[in-house]
Amino acid sequence: IYESIYRQGFMISLYTNATLVTPEIMELLRKYPPHKIGISIYGASPETYHKVCGNAAAFEKMLEGSRLLCTLPSVTEFRTTIIKDNLCDSRKIEKLVKENFGERHSVTQTRMVMKAVRGACADVESCRLSPQDNVKLSLQKSIDILRERIGDGFDENNVRIRQENLKKNADCGSAVNHRLSLFGCSGGMTAFAVTWEGKLQACQTLGAFSTDAVELGLKKAWETFPLSVKLPEPNKKCLNCEMSDLCQSCYALRYAETGNLQDCPEYACRDCEVMKSFCL
């Protein structure tokens, strides 16, 4: 599959935890290097990997695999998802990446952990951070920079964010305001995902609407996908919410968190409330 889509001219982004990078896989990747590689790291020690993944040995395998992948001419980036079990490593992961793979690399953190839409062996609500810790984590890098520059007089309790009125700006004739969209993003417009059973949908998370790429063929499944989309009336609470500019909720997140496209996801709402407390 990989070789075929590469030969068709697709720009491939390869996402991996880097623990199963074998000589055979490297031989293929050297012949057909992906345009971009995203490596997921779940801790900065074997102990944390054991807590998060149940396999302490995966830590060294990740480092070894990452070193091999970094020899490719691909653009390489590192990412992580922080939950309760690896919160203690949130800064250490960034340090690990810079020490092993160079100062130019940083680590992208998942902004919000949503519930699983497919089978999962863990209860997301018991694993993910509280909204308070999640927001603080998202501001951590900025707070660390301020602390370094200000010095001993810095008090993170006094940090406030200036909030721009995005709605007001969008009403001033912005071209973005008039862009055609199905879900308010690129999903179903310039991007799609195909599931393991051949269902074409807007993204990996939003499975409420789909066409059958196996039965129809990829071209027709893509062309007819918009016809499968029938969105409900917008939630009035969300339409009138004063925190909408801060909201991380999209149709996919709503679907994952509530099981439908209309209800308010409580976790995202609480996240907004905490973020609002940091705003001027």
Report residues per predicted region:
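Conserved Radical SAM active-site core
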Residues: 1-15, 19-32
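Structural motif
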Residues: 15-17, 81, 273
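Structural motif corresponding to alpha-helix initiation and N-cap regions
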Residues: 22-23, 46, 231, 235
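Alpha-helix termination/capping residues and helix-transition junctions
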Residues: 31, 99-100, 235, 244
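Radical SAM enzyme [4Fe-4S]-AdoMet core and its adjacent flexible, acidic
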Residues: 35-36, 40-187, 193-197, 205
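Flexible mid-to-C-terminal extensions adjoining Fe-S/redox cofactors in radical SAM and related proteins
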Residues: 175, 179-182, 199-200, 204-280
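A short helix-loop-beta-strand connector motif used in the catalytic cores of GNAT acetyltransferases and
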Residues: 188-189, 232
